[in-house]
Design a protein with these regions (language model features):
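Histidine-acidic metal/acid-base catalytic patches
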Residues: 1-31, 59-61, 116, 122, ...
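Active-site acidic/histidine proton-transfer and metal-coordination neighborhood
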Residues: 17-25, 60, 79-210, 291, ...
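Glycine-rich, positively charged N-terminal anion/phosphate-binding segment
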Residues: 20-23, 45-62, 66, 71
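Conserved beta-strand positions in the central sheet of alpha/beta enzyme cores
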Residues: 36, 67-69, 127, 181, ...
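Glycine-rich, proline-tolerant flexible connector loops at the mouths of alpha/beta enzymes
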Residues: 36-59, 130-137
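Short, small-residue-enriched loops and turns at beta-alpha junctions
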Residues: 43-44, 74-76, 133-135, 186-190, ...
Length: 344
């Protein structure tokens, strides 16, 4: 009998105001079978919840722990060298005026301890994104100012910087059998699939260099089909998120107020992307089979990260979980429809 290969899960990054207990209760009450808390949600005191505490809460609410995301701290780790104040929302106040070297060292220690927790929980994937390793100029994706000129080559310098700054974290991940899953995303070390494949090349095919698929950032001509087919063998995790692009508006205008922007995250059912086709794409590139083999599970998570500049966060998230549960967790075909067309 045909069975689903997915289950509905939820990302914790936008729910940082909730405790782990509250987050898992919200996930369960909304209809999720799994949850992916963020690093902030699993913090406790000066460290993290113990693996036992996480397991106990998981069992209490009947919700699987599908992974622990750590986007913000990984991003700070590879961005601190720029001296940008944009790292401050994601690190403790005592680091706001510290040197880039001290911030980077703090992030490295924090992330290694987080990897210890993930390994103890038998989790294999850490969704995240690498920071501005190539500098803010290159992160614009537009070579003005010029990316190379007299005495400088920002991309070549960035390659060396990325390899050196990420070496310890990649080694620590490999030592624990973990996959560091980069979300291909604006203003990170990889804005598109070609950028990510370049990172894999310069790290000599490092096994820990993986991808979390997220179609909501495919809004500058690279479609989800193009992006995730190019990195297909590296996709070890998956977000479900939708968006619209408001017509006639510039995608890159200098306005940080989200309701004013052209690119808008929206509830899952009504965005520009067809989420069922996205789920089929994930099956086609082998994501659920890889996740199941890594974790010894019967299904792989579709991690809802639904958000909106207009709709209440909890309402948007709950709606997204229920949409995934009802529309994307479908029984998968065991044979071609053509096989049933012949005479018996």
């Amino acid at each position: 009998m045909s069975k689903p290969v997915f289950h509905a899960s939820i990302e914790g990054a936008q729910h940082g105001g909730k405790s782990l207990d509250e987050f898992l209760k919200f996930a369960k009450d909304s209809g999720a079978a799994g949850a992916q808390p963020s690093n902030f949600i699993v913090e406790s005191g000066d460290g993290f919840h113990s693996a036992k505490e996480v397991r106990d809460l998981s069992e209490k609410h009947g919700v699987k722990i599908d992974g622990i995301s750590a986007h913000c701290v990984y991003w700070v780790h590879t961005t601190a060298w720029t001296g940008s104040p944009t790292i401050r929302p994601f690190v403790p106040g005592h680091l706001h005026n510290e040197s880039p070297e001290k911030v980077e060292a703090w992030c490295e220690d924090y992330l290694i301890r987080l990897m210890d927790l993930a390994a103890e929980l038998d989790l294999k994937t850490i969704p995240m994104f690498w920071g501005i390793a190539f500098g803010w100029e290159v992160a614009t994706g537009y070579p003005w100012g010029l990316f190379s000129g007299p005495g400088y080559d920002l991309i070549e310098e960035g390659k060396e910087r990325f390899v050196n700054k990420t070496a310890k974290l990649r080694q620590e991940a490999n030592d624990r059998g973990l996959y560091i899953c980069h979300e291909i995303h604006p203003n990170t070390a990889a804005l598109c699939a070609d950028d990510f494949n370049m990172l894999v090349d310069i790290t000599d095919g490092d096994k820990s260099m993986a991808v979390i698929a997220d179609p909501s950032h495919c809004w500058e001509n690279e479609t989800p089909e193009t992006r995730f087919q190019k990195v297909r063998d590296r996709v070890m995790a998956a977000h479900v998120k939708n968006f619209v692009v408001r017509p006639g508006m510039n995608l890159r205008k200098m306005d940080g107020d989200w309701p004013n922007r052209a690119h808008q995250f929206v509830d899952l059912p009504t965005g520009d992307l067809n989420m069922v086709r996205y789920a089929e794409l994930l099956i086609n590139i082998g994501y659920p089979e890889r996740y199941k083999a890594l974790h010894g599970t019967e299904t792989a998570p579709l991690v809802v990260e639904a958000e909106s500049a207009y709709r209440d966060l909890d309402a948007t998230s709950a709606n997204g979980i229920q949409y995934v549960r009802d529309e994307l967790v479908f029984p998968v075909a065991e044979m071609s429809f053509e096989e049933g067309m012949g005479a018996k």
